[in-house]
Regions:
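Metal-dependent catalytic core segments for phosphate chemistry
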Residues: 195-218, 534-578, 582, 687, ...
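C-terminal polymerase-core module
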Residues: 378, 382-385, 389, 396-450, ...
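Conserved "right-hand" nucleotidyltransferase catalytic core of DNA-directed polymerases
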Residues: 155-218, 252, 261, 278, ...
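Conserved catalytic core of nucleic-acid polymerases
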Residues: 352-359, 476, 480-481, 485-488, ...
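Acidic beta-strand-to-loop metal/phosphate-binding motif
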Residues: 93-99, 238-249, 525-527
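A generic structural motif
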Residues: 743-749
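A polyanion-binding, active-site-adjacent surface
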Residues: 1-160
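Conserved RNase H-like, two-metal-ion catalytic cores of nucleic-acid enzymes
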Residues: 14, 20-21, 25-32, 36-37, ...
């Protein structure tokens, strides 16, 4: 079964026929076929330009053709032989395997994600693998990727055989050769390789066809000479260096060799991700999209795995340099245009302060760590005991016990013992977190199950212990993370473990862990956090009078929203929140409410809330906080119910009241939709542009709506980090930045300079509160909260006016 022009010189090989192929008498029918037609049209390939054949025309299950490692069975080998014979008769110029099976048949390699987009010469024709349009092709980025690969195939559709680009790579040069190569080089790409905990080599490329790789694995006197030559070049501010994820190289050069990069830096990964945030951003991917260099990244691991020699590893480094140079030549004009240049240069400006954060780290109190572990173990034991009592009560069986870590036991309990209809995932019963959230909620047929909530809490604490409390620290007992400047599409940082496997994601440090992250001796920690940043920004973006009114009156937005949604007096909301705190036990919450007297109103809480709906498992203010965090971003009632643990009917009522009180939000959403449709992207109020790919449906609109405030919030904190790092003020020089976490920055300040602390905090506050202008022309700022203390987990709230006095009191109390 085939499709298209049999005489075409471009042949597409699909893995299997479309599901409706025999019904419709077409190999590319149905939804997948329609998708392929769209991709071909986007690539400029007409029906007459291509011929489609099938690698597996009888639709044999893939498992009967090849195993998971790509080894063909006898049936698979026969199919591969048939395909090759058919292609030899067709005499194509280019063949495009569109899937894992067809890729394996032609290239004897099943690793499609590594090979796609590369060109290979095979038996008289060229082979360019791509992804399967019948499966992954329904994902918008994948459609663009397949289209790009087909465009490449169209360009290569000539009789001439494919020849990989010639590369002149000088490896292990003498010092005088290195000096001559770099002497007249003002603009180079650069890449390092680390092996055995040391920088093994540094590669440079000053054009698209050549590279020079400096081998640093040599006797110390020679190594010192090579380091001096490389350092002089990289530390020269008149030079320009292009890298791929070059913050990694900068961090390693400083951490391992105290080599500072002062040259002007460009980064292909950052450039690509700013322009196309939905695509992958590895050098492998960028090479396949922007160059004609075939896949080579395996070569980097050959020597480390005992394959090949050191020369092959050096040669691999040179290929990285040439690939990076070529990618930059394709990207630079667009990313340095007015459309993207501001956010690109701002992102690159973060490199130096982030390298400092990665190098400095945060002091760890190992004794406190052991105490935190012990407290968590005791908490798990206590919660587990509570769970056993609850399941005995719920099941009316005094001998009932359950292992919260056993999905089988949990399913038997909920769906067997209690006889509840099972929640399913992929058609099978499940007790995952979403299912437990549903079980914890009340329905018209039953009360919410506290046992489900306890199991959630136990699993969360168990994960906390295994994921966060058993992490590795560096030898100097400091907590470090590896920061990623474009870790998210909004411009927010992300982070993870260091190259050595120590540390963890600094963005998700739980409160329990912060207790043992402490100030250095004779220092005090300061955390400055944006106050309800995204909510405030959204208020001005939407120009909603209700939200702006809450901000200008200075009322806590979470309490104000709770009052609007429930009708409960503000004083009662504040009193109840103070009494309940973060308690989630519905019985305990009910008891607290029944006994609570709101002193400012001289009335029982129950009387003041008569007729109002109350969330079972959280305080009224916490419910308002959940509304503020979710409903601005178009969350529906069902998802809101899962997020809050409230009943769906309650969530529908809360959502309706929220959107009635803040009535400009739905209008703003539609304005955002119109903007995305007209420009295929958005520019936020800090002049940062983001492109959006695909159909402008509700899913994309939710992403776009969330992007606008989140990107502005990230921009404020990141720009403050840059400004404060480079500040010439003596007070700022004394203050050290230790972490950048979402909407906050953590500092430490020497206690022997507390007289200057208030001034430092004032400068930092000014940096963190730039004046913004809404689309309606209204100027506004997002306020900053401040906390200080000796442990990140035990900070004291203060004000910028009182921070000096508070610091002195803390210091005196500690003495």
């Amino acid at each position: 079964m085939t499709w298209g022009n049999e005489k075409a010189k471009l042949i597409l090989v699909i893995d299997r026929p479309a599901s409706r192929a025999y019904t419709d008498s077409s190999i590319i029918s149905g939804r997948g076929g329609h998708n392929l037609h769209l991709i071909l049209a986007h690539a400029g390939i007409s029906n007459n330009d291509a011929y489609v054949v099938c690698a597996n025309p009888t639709d044999i299950p893939e498992g009967a053709i090849m195993n998971t490692k790509g080894v063909l069975t006898e049936r698979g080998a026969n199919l591969a032989r048939d395909l090759k014979s058919a292609l030899e008769l067709l005499k194509p110029h280019v063949v495009v395997p569109m899937g894992r099976v067809s890729c394996t048949f032609l290239l004897q390699d099943h690793r499609l994600d590594k090979l796609r987009g590369s060109c290979f010469q095979y038996n008289g024709f060229k082979v360019i693998p791509t992804r399967n349009p019948f499966t992954s092709g329904f994902n918008t980025p994948d459609r663009y990727i397949i289209s790009a690969d087909l465009s490449k195939a169209k360009r290569h559709c000539t009789p001439e055989p494919y020849k990989p680009p010639d590369m002149n790579i000088i490896i292990d040069p003498a010092p005088n050769v290195v000096e001559r190569y770099l002497a007249d080089a003002d603009h180079v790409s650069c890449d390092i390789e680390v092996a055995g905990g040391q920088v093994f080599c540094i590669g440079f490329s000053k054009d698209e066809d050549s590279a020079m790789v400096v081998n640093l694995d040599r006797p110390i006197p020679e190594r010192a000479v090579m380091w001096r030559i490389c350092a002089e070049f990289l530390d020269d501010p008149t030079k320009t260096v292009v890298g791929q994820n070059f913050i990694y190289d900068m961090n390693m050069l400083w951490r391992l060799n105290y080599l500072r990069v002062s040259a002007k830096v460009h980064d292909t990964m950052i450039a690509h991700h700013i322009m196309y945030p939905e695509f992958e951003k590895s050098l492998q991917f960028l090479t396949s999209m922007y160059t004609t260099i075939p896949y080579y990244k395996d070569e980097g691991g050959f020597w480390k795995r005992g394959i090949g020699d050191r020369k092959s590893f050096l040669y691999y480094n040179g290929k990285d340099c040439i690939a990076t140079y070529r990618v930059w030549e394709k990207l630079k004009d667009k990313v340095l245009s007015d459309k993207f240049i501001s956010q690109y240069t701002e992102t690159i400006s973060m490199y130096e302060p982030l390298v400092y954060l990665m190098y400095r780290g945060i002091n760890v109190d190992m004794k406190e760590l052991e105490l935190v572990k012990q407290r968590l173990k005791e908490e798990i034991t206590s919660l587990d005991a509570s769970l056993q009592g609850v399941v005995q009560k719920e099941s009316d069986h005094e001998c009932m016990e359950i292992n919260y870590n056993s999905p089988k036991q949990c399913m038997t309990y909920f769906y067997g013992t209690l006889g509840l209809p099972p929640y399913r995932k992929a058609g099978k019963p499940t007790v995952d977190d979403k299912a437990l959230a549903q079980l914890a909620k009340s329905t018209s047929a039953r009360e919410g199950l506290y046992s489900a909530q306890l199991i959630q809490q136990l699993r969360q604490r168990n994960k906390l212990f295994s994921t966060y409390l058993d992490i590795e620290f560096d030898k100097d007992q400091r907590f470090r993370s590896e920061y990623r400047p474009r870790g998210t599409r909004t411009g927010r940082l992300s982070s993870g473990k260091t190259f050595w496997g120590s540390g963890m994601n600094a963005q998700n440090v739980p409160p329990e862990m912060k207790a043992f992250l402490v100030a250095d001796p004779d220092c005090l920690l300061i955390e400055m956090d944006k106050r309800q940043s995204e909510w405030v920004i959204t208020a001005y973006l939407a120009n909603d009078p209700g939200m702006i009114g809450v901000i200008t009156t200075g009322v806590d937005p979470h309490s104000a929203t709770a009052e609007m949604v429930t009708g409960i007096p503000l004083d009662a909301i504040l009193a109840e929140n103070k009494a309940i705190g973060h308690t989630t036990n519905p019985e305990e919450i009910e008891r607290i409410r029944s006994e609570l007297i709101v002193e400012s109103l001289s009335a029982p809480f129950k009387l003041l809330t008569e007729g109002s709906f109350l969330p079972r498992t959280l305080s009224v203010r916490q419910m308002g906080k959940k509304c503020n965090h979710a409903l601005n971003y178009m969350m529906g009632a069902r998802q809101f119910s899962l997020e809050t643990g409230m009943g769906e009917a309650e969530c529908i009522e809360a959502r309706n009241k929220y959107l009635s009180g803040y009535s400009r939000l739905p209008e703003w959403w539609e304005e955002v939709r119109a903007d995305v449709k007209s420009d295929r992207g958005l520019r936020n109020i800090t002049n940062q542009y983001r492109a959006f790919l695909g159909l402008v449906d509700d899913a994309m609109l939710k992403d776009a709506v969330a992007h606008l405030p989140q990107s502005v919030s990230a921009w404020m904190v990141n720009m403050a980090m840059i400004d404060l790092y480079h500040s010439p003020h003596a007070e700022c020089v004394a203050g050290e930045m230790l972490a950048n976490v979402h909407d906050s920055i953590l500092f430490q300040y020497p206690t022997d300079r507390l007289d200057e602390l208030a001034r430092f905090c004032s400068i930092a506050k000014h940096a963190m509160e730039p004046e913004l202008t809404s689309p309606a022309g209204i100027p506004f700022r997002v306020e900053t909260d401040i906390k200080i203390g000796f442990s990140w987990g035990h900070m004291v709230e203060t004000t910028f006016q009182e921070v000096g006095d508070t610091a002195w009191k803390l210091l005196e109390a500690r003495r």
